[in-house]
Amino acid sequence: MTRGLRALPLLLLAACSTAPVSFRAPARLVAQADDLVEQGQAQEASRVYERVLREYPTDPAAASALYGLGRLQASPASPLRSYRAAHATFSRLLSEYPQSRWEREARAWRAVLGDLLAREDESARLRAQIERLRRTDLDLERRR
């Protein structure tokens, strides 16, 4: 009986906590999404990250959700891999949450992805040029 009475003040104190459950929910959701990424459930993780961004845009966990989403999009092993989307996600993180704890990492990711995208664009341009030259060469061979 005395145990129950000792627990009562703790229960009352917890009920009067200044941090409502909704303020703890975003961090829990980000942790859940991170776990889903580790389990290889990229699609579901993406949905959870997006939920945090939609429902808690002003919570500090929103920056963590963007960071997790950007890493998911940048991962070569991810079925959601899109370097352009990842670059845009890290840019959004830097724009919307410039003082977040992820600022330095997001800046580094964005720089690396920007370089990668520039190289991919140049590679595509060169492949197209090679294809045009190949066709021109074939046309010249036929005319001989």
Question: What are the functions of these language-model segments?
Answer:
Residues A15-Q32:
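Bacterial Sec signal peptide processing site at the extreme N-terminus
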Residues R24-A25, L29, A61, S82, ...:
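Structural signature of alpha-solenoid helical repeat junctions
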Residues E55-A62, L93-R107:
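Short solvent-exposed coil/turn linkers within tandem alpha-helical repeat scaffolds
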